Amino acid sequence: MKSESRPSNQFGCSTVKPDRVRMIFASPINPVLESLMFTGIIEECGEVAALKPVETGAELWVNSTFTGEVALGESVANNGACLTVTEVKDGAMRFDLLHETLRLTNLGDLAPGDPVNLERSLRIGDRLSGHFVQGHVDACAEILAYEPVGQDHQFTVALPNEFAHLVVHKGSICVNGISLTVADLQKDRFTLWIIPHTHEVTSLKAATVGSRVNLEFDMLAKHIARITELSKS
């Protein structure tokens, strides 16, 4: 019986086809890579074209410059919430929002003309410049302060008590889809420093005190907290 030879490179090592690479990255052996979809590096600040209430929740239309590059069914994070592209028309993408999505995120607060932070899902080979972000919003929180300090901005956000154990000083947190570092941590709030570039290319340039932002806490912290909780029961 003739055996099938496997392709190899100049070092005599077998090469792996791209589809095999995808299988490896999405295998149960790599749960972190399987769930990793975004990094919190905003690709574009889109603009809300419309938010239409429907029986199942709402239809969100967002103007974007990369509509010609997205396919139906593709995942795009909107203010940090992973949504599915369900239609593309006239330079805008449509996303269907369930009532649960409207309840758990700030997407229902949006109005036509509002900026939205957009990030397409990762492809194998992309640089991981931020931190592991799933696009699963854990909570909404109120902006307590957004003040210019020199060229930067000091950004303070309320910290819901039930999630306080997931935030650490100098740790990563995703705020409205942006990967940021906790600069100061208090019992009921945390503070971030925003550099000029981040201020200019994200929705933070329109940030107002009292408005809500989406929070996604560090994935590893959530898993550790869950393991600790179960070990005590």
Regions found by a protein language model. Name each.
Residues R6, R20-R22, R123:
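Basic polycationic patches enriched in arginine
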Residues V32-S233:
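Conserved loop->alpha-helix
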